[in-house]
């Protein structure tokens, strides 16, 4: 879900470069890491300027040069599986939901940051890059967080004090004109489990449970757990009153908010420019608590060390760069800023000055990382489809039946290896 479409300003990069040089770690003796030592990193074109400066600052004290290569972001994971060892990267950038696949195939290796370094990150950010069948291990250094929030047009509504307040305002606005919609949340015929997740979590829903060891358990499916089903009648109520309508797709939702035909919009930081240039005051907050805190799904971007680094004789160096230097607050500011996202590092997060970005960061507190195990691929369609069926207006399926059927379909797909 992470979209990397914005660039870090030249001024910020320059400032970060100076800070990186000041904070560069003490170097081992030059003979231990001769100047010929090179680390190859696959990044996309948006990240390259920031990564170049970070690797240069780190490498100068270690006699290491960075070979930062632009690689088609959508092909990094698949290409890592087929690349010849001599052409393989030592480090890659990628979203946290690649981890289960890559770790299960032995393509990325665990990291062991110092306790003081890990303390600078919220637990859910570290959890996003953790994977294991018996014990969770950290397989990546998170640097950017992405999540949806509730955008409020302050000209048409006030920031809701509760879910009941939100519901009352949204429906009152809808009644003012036949062109208005209560809530601009995208679904469409294909569904959108990602944008709907705050409602799902707020009713007690979850995708997968965990083992006693804390690892994700694909056999423990929470799509139709008892608590959620107990609260599912609220979805039927929202459908009847028109608070949520699955006929609203992404384009419809965006246009309604921009044209002021919706006072509320569920969206993410990829629409930051839209919010800033809307022509009316906007505030982004977390959706108010329903029965439980309405937390969003989190998408997390990070760097991972590949198995090839050891074969290239740079395994320890790659781990030091990713598991320590890239996790420092100054590095995190540059990396997250490069694609207009909120830093994973808490210290770096405090330095964010962009008000909209900061609001999205706050809206993501306590968020749930999208499950990074392969079985998540069996969830999206059916979970999104359950919302579509239960909120399509006239003729909708009861939420209890829609989500119970979805849970069964997901379990069947997982059992068959789908």
What are these regions (language model features)?
Residues 170, 213-247:
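Glycine-centered hinge/linker elements that transmit conformational signals in sensory
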Residues 96-147, 161, 165-167, 284:
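Hinge/lid segment of periplasmic solute-binding proteins
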Residues 269-281, 290-385:
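C-terminal lobe and pocket-closing loops
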Residues 77-88, 104-105, 171-175, 236-238, ...:
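Short helices/loops that flank or line small-molecule/ion binding pockets
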Residues 363-418:
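Conserved C-terminal helix/tail region of periplasmic/extracytoplasmic solute-binding proteins
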Residues 137-144, 148, 167-219, 262:
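Extracytoplasmic/periplasmic solute-binding protein
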Residues 2-15, 21, 25-100, 269, ...:
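Conserved N-terminal structural module of periplasmic/extracytoplasmic solute-binding proteins
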Residues 82-83, 87-90, 118-154, 288, ...:
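A structural signal for short loop-to-beta-strand junctions that line the ligand-binding cleft
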């Amino acid at each position: 879900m992470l979209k990397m479409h914005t660039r870090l300003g030249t001024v910020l990069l320059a400032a970060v470069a100076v800070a990186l040089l000041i904070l560069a770690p003490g170097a081992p003796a030059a003979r231990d890491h001769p100047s010929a030592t090179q680390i190859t990193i696959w990044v996309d074109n948006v990240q390259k300027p920031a990564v170049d400066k970070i690797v240069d600052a780190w490498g100068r004290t270690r006699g290491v040069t960075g070979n930062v290569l632009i690689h088609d972001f959508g092909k990094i994971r698949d290409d890592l599986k087929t690349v010849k060892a001599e052409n393989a990267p030592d480090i890659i950038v990628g979203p946290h939901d690649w981890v289960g696949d890559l770790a299960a195939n032995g393509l990325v290796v665990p990291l062991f940051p110092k306790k003081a370094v890990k303390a600078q990150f919220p637990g859910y950010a570290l959890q996003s890059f953790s994977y294991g069948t018996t014990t969770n291990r950290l397989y990546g250094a998170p640097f950017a967080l992405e999540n949806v929030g509730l955008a409020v047009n302050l000209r048409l509504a006030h920031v809701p004090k509760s879910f009941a307040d939100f519901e009352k305002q949204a429906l009152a606005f809808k009644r003012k004109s036949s062109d208005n919609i209560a809530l601009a949340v995208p679904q469409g015929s294909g569904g959108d489990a990602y944008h709907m997740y705050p409602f799902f979590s707020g009713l007690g829903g979850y995708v997968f449970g965990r083992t006693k060891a804390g690892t994700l358990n694909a056999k423990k499916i929470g799509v139709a757990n008892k608590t959620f089903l107990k609260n599912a009648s609220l979805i039927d109520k929202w459908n009847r009153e028109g608070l949520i309508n699955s006929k609203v797709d992404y384009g419809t939702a965006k246009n309604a908010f921009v044209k002021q035909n919706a006072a509320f919009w569920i969206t993410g930081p990829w629409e930051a420019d839209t919010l800033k240039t809307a022509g009316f005051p906007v505030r982004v907050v977390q959706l108010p608590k329903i029965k439980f805190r309405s937390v969003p799904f989190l998408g997390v971007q990070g760097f991972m060390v590949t198995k090839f680094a050891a074969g290239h004789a740079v395994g320890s160096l790659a781990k030091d760069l990713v598991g320590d230097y890239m996790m420092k607050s100054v590095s995190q500011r540059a990396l997250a800023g490069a694609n207009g996202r909120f830093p994973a590092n808490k210290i770096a997060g405090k330095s964010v000055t962009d008000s909209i970005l900061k609001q999205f960061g706050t809206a993501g507190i306590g968020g749930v990382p999208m499950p990074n195990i392969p079985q998540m691929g069996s969830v999206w369609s059916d979970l999104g489809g359950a919302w579509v069926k239960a909120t399509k207006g006239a003729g909708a399926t009861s939420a209890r039946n829609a989500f119970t059927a979805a849970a069964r379909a997901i379990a069947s797909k997982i059992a068959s290896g789908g």
